[in-house]
Amino acid sequence: MEKEKTCKIVFSDIDGTLLTSDGQITEGTKEMILNLENKGIPFILTSARSPEGVRVIKRMLGNHAPIIAFCGGLILDNDGNEIYSKMIPLKRALELKAMLDKDFPAVACNTFGGEKW
């Protein structure tokens, strides 16, 4: 008899995945997430958004799991405490910005520190 495979955790992007084209979450999706959480399966929101941008969706869901923001650059627990952060050292970031300004002047750069863009 084959052992039943069980899901231990679910990760989901937000924009274009979890949200409808008009920025809503369907009742069916909310129900599915609640069912997962009732089974003890964390539903982790992941996004390129800032932490506050992820928290907006987290509040819509009543979600109590950690969040992954800035494309994985920052992971926070349910209370907003940092679990993981990967920053580019300031000196290196300034070198990259100078190179982009020189070679690709039309490219826009976004930076973040902590929870701010």
Language model features with spans:
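Active-site phosphate-binding/coordination module
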Residues: E27-W117
